[in-house]
Amino acid sequence: MNRAICREALVTAGLLREPWLRQAFDTVDREAFVPAAVWLDVLDEEGRWTFVDRDEDPEAWRRAVWNPYRSVITQLNDGAVARGPSAGDFTSSVSAPDIVMRKLQHLDLRVNARVLEIGYGSGYHTALLCERVGEERVVAVEVDEEVARTGASQLAAAGYEPELIVGDGLCGAPGGGPFDRVINTAALRRVPYAWIEQSRRSGVILTPFGTAYSNAGLLKLRVDGTGTRAQGRFVGESSYMWIRSQRPTVDLRVPEASTSRSSPVDPAQVLGLGHLQDFAIGLQVPDVSYSHQGEGPARRVQFVDEAGTSATIVRYGDWWAQDAVRCWGPRDVWAEVTAAYTWYELQGRPHLTRFGITAGQDGQFAWLDEPGRLVGS
């Protein structure tokens, strides 16, 4: 695997059709922005993430760098994991070339645009932006100090000097813009109003977006003429690691008392038909997450709300039984999820790209086809 093979794959997928993207891909050396030691999203026999060291296996490292479809993981557990094969959560990466180019195409980036990048990480994405608009028009923010130092060093070594800020990207940039484009490189659940405030009228905000239930959308918003609201549709799929302050977390503290009932539907119909269905359901129950337990006849699924006050467990094997569903707390979370599933089916199982978000100072809401048609209604 090398740059030429990666380039051909991107061209074949239609991801380098804009001349500036081809030029930027050819100019910016991805290898200069990938550390010598990285992890791959491939598990070894012991359930650990595969570790690749350039000094020990330069060919494996280069294959990882130029794989068109796979990200390279540069940090686990916010830096708490040392070098070597390990378990842990991905907390920083160099995104796969295909999603990088797809996002840049959706950004509709003009030569004279001023750009705010949230999460510059390794600096690779930042360098591509600099190639298009010039380093003097790029402001990039990174929350992790260690990652920021590495990214800044790699950008400088490659000859790029955009304005780099270490801080919380959800607050935008000190001084406030205005920016023609805001591009985020981590998934979020709530669009920060600061990004809208710091955007020009008709400016574009592009971000991975998800819910506690499902993390799968790439959202493209346009700021309206008042500069106080942004709305737009999901333009494709993406699954990024969470922006740090919006990671879904649950401190479960449900009451001991519970109620039992049967399920109206096989949970496999609700949970086993793919991530696009999950995404549509999640837009209706954005504060609900689920996890599976057990195997075979003992398999079951647990749903919890983000407040930690309600939980529901549903058995798969005999979902029709009178005690197959067990609920704790004030919310019947499984009832909410199945209602969302029913709504999705009644709408004809709409594709992710028919959904959209409107965001403003007073919050955000999801809709289907047009802003007046709220999800679930």
Tell me the role of every PLM-derived stretch:
Residues 309-377:
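C-terminal target-recognition/interaction regions appended to catalytic cores
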Residues 172, 229-241, 309-314, 320:
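Glycine-centered structural positions embedded in regular secondary structure
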Residues 183, 189-300, 367, 375-376:
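Class I SAM-binding transferase module
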Residues 1-116, 125, 147, 160, ...:
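Class I SAM-dependent transferase core
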Residues 14, 29-33, 184, 341, ...:
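Short amphipathic alpha-helical segments enriched in hydrophobics
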Residues 87-206, 212-213:
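Conserved nucleotide-cofactor-binding alpha/beta core module
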Residues 287-292, 296-315, 320-324:
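Long low-complexity, intrinsically disordered regions
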